[in-house]
Amino acid sequence: MPGVIPSESNGLSRGSPSKKNRLSLKFFQKKETKRALDFTDSQENEEKASEYRASEIDQVVPAAQSSPINCEKRENLLPFVGLNNLGNTCYLNSILQVLYFCPGFKSGVKHLFNIISRKKEALKDEANQKDKGNCKEDSLASYELICSLQSLIISVEQLQASFLLNPEKYTDELATQPRRLLNTLRELNPMYEGYLQHDAQEVLQCILGNIQETCQLLKKEEVKNVAELPTKVEEIPHPKEEMNGINSIEMDSMRHSEDFKEKLPKGNGKRKSDTEFGNMKKKVKLSKEHQSLEENQRQTRSKRKATSDTLESPPKIIPKYISENESPRPSQKKSRVKINWLKSATKQPSILSKFCSLGKITTNQGVKGQSKENECDPEEDLGKCESDNTTNGCGLESPGNTVTPVNVNEVKPINKGEEQIGFELVEKLFQGQLVLRTRCLECESLTERREDFQDISVPVQEDELSKVEESSEISPEPKTEMKTLRWAISQFASVERIVGEDKYFCENCHHYTEAERSLLFDKMPEVITIHLKCFAASGLEFDCYGGGLSKINTPLLTPLKLSLEEWSTKPTNDSYGLFAVVMHSGITISSGHYTASVKVTDLNSLELDKGNFVVDQMCEIGKPEPLNEEEARGVVENYNDEEVSIRVGGNTQPSKVLNKKNVEAIGLLGGQKSKADYELYNKASNPDKVASTAFAENRNSETSDTTGTHESDRNKESSDQTGINISGFENKISYVVQSLKEYEGKWLLFDDSEVKVTEEKDFLNSLSPSTSPTSTPYLLFYKKL
């Protein structure tokens, strides 16, 4: 029996593997858990992982060799700012780059922005007037394009100056985002919403058209303000003159009291105040005050109260006139208006008096206390317009004052100056005038019609080419001769013969005759924009690209210098030089890519000259600018182009302004460089505290000269310290100017955020290629030399 048991145990042990096979799934799961708890396997896995990590480290080490590439990129970075593509916005970026380098455009936008900022400050002062508020909110919306352009110019110049002073901070690209301007364009024209491709010429016309409308609106408001000046009379008399005026009032009131009682019944005066307009209300009201002054000597207290109540009711009609003058000043005006009203009492007020009153405005001249003032009186103006016998302007003079009439025409030259140039920004730079002449072939009479233009659309191939293609069965693309830009302009200004059914009706001959029609240039702008008609309607094979407008890749020989004397109405010696080109690469108008090539010819237009930097540094150190809420929206009210470099190396207050602008609003820098630029201004703010405090100590010590020798020594030390800082800053400016002069006369290729330098030979080859490439010039910009 005991021998049987081992045999059974052996059998069981041998039979156990069969059970394992039957329960293999569960047993393998338990076995996997045991293996997971085994440390020997984990050690082997760690050894394998360490070997794998070592192999990875060996592979990562060669990747560190990419640093020389970054160094090369940093060395290849140019001190010119590109524009980030915000979704098929290459059409906008190319136009903005051309406008930025257009001579006179930045200064004109800056001047318009200063006018708008002053108007905004004036609107803040008049915010309590609810009637005018609704009208001027719409005008403020039209000003947004100027503000957006100015903020973009500021951001570009600020980024350019920061790169020139600290080039090691930028390794990838030098670009900013025109997001605010794009949003403004989308508000002005909903066509630009979304991310579709648009025509560069259309967006140029949209920008210039809105700028022109804004200039016209500003000009109308300026003329309106000049016309409203006569209604706002300001008087600042000397105290002695006030006493003389009061004495004259008492004498005149005693002298003319009986005349007032006879010629001015109470009922008529009250009715005039209810029915008449303008200054007649004021005259009747003042005449009542004269009566009250005379009767107060004999009236009781109750009567005085009653008359005072009647006198307090008219100010509700004209609160502004009363609030602007103090108590002695209206009294000084009472005698003057009273005598004038008596002088012209027989005349009825007419519409002519309202127009005559517009010819006078208030002037405040003289030295210190002396004042010269004009008062507008409709009756006196009417008498002046009818008889021309009055020589002292409006009204009689009081003993202490001299009245001098000032005409509106005499004030216009004062307001013209820079503002008139700013209001005509588009007209002066881009707008010219064409003359359409029609000559009758029978009587040789001429008729002319003038039209304004902002660009010239010229063909790039002959119109008969399509007919040749239809009739030709040999080649679908027949070879044509190379055309030139002068040929294209001659086609634009060609002489057209009107014959057949399109005959011209001559007013001299009184019947339809044959005629010749020509188009000539009468007035030429500073910048001529030539639009090459590279897109034409074609077959259905291009409908899939949208619009059915295919690209004409016919090359056109474009000269660097151009003269339009041949097509001008009068002889001229003006010549134009090519300074910018917008290129288009693609096959249709709704697809492809736009780039801009600009020639750097005038570095002074970049506002980076040495004098402006030093002056702005002294101003910035002495007077730091406050931080306003509007600056968070990207518009700096007191900011100008000359403060670009000082923002980088100036005091701490403007650096805060820039930090807030970079973080919150317009996103001056695109992509990763906003953080780097933010850190740049924070690091640059510490050394500026020393200069600002030193300059403050210098000014404080100068005001107190009797404070002792210690303060004088401190003054010398602080002045020496500021002198060292300024001299070091001048060295930086000279280095910046010298570095920019290297690019004088070179062509820059702006491909959105990328900026490259192209040789003149390569540029001419791309401008006038020998073959028919897909990249062809689309807009040519010539400036007057």
Curated annotation (Swiss-Prot):
Gene3D superfamilies: Cysteine proteinases. The keyword Nucleotide-binding does not apply. It comes from the Eukaryota. Its EC number is 3.4.19.12. Its main location: nucleus. Residues 1-21, 33-52, 258-336, 693-723 are annotated as: Disordered. Residues 7-16 have a biased composition (Polar residues). Autocatalytic cleavage of USP1 following UV irradiation inactivates it, leading to an increase in ubiquitinated PCNA, recruitment of POLH and translesion synthesis. InterPro entries: Papain-like_cys_pep_sf (IPR038765), Peptidase_C19 (IPR050164), Peptidase_C19_UCH (IPR001394), USP1 (IPR033815), USP_CS (IPR018200), USP_dom (IPR028889). Residues 81-785 form the USP domain. Changing residue 90 to S: Loss of catalytic activity including autolysis. It is found in: Nucleus. Disulfide bonds: none annotated. GO terms for molecular function: cysteine-type deubiquitinase activity; cysteine-type endopeptidase activity; peptidase activity. It is an enzyme of class 3 (hydrolase). Induction: Down-regulated following DNA damage. The modification Phosphoserine is found at residues 16, 42, 67, 313, 475, 768. HEK293T cells expressing reduced levels of USP1 show a higher level of ubiquitinated PCNA and an increase in point mutations upon UV irradiation. This is Ubiquitin carboxyl-terminal hydrolase 1. It comes from Homo sapiens.
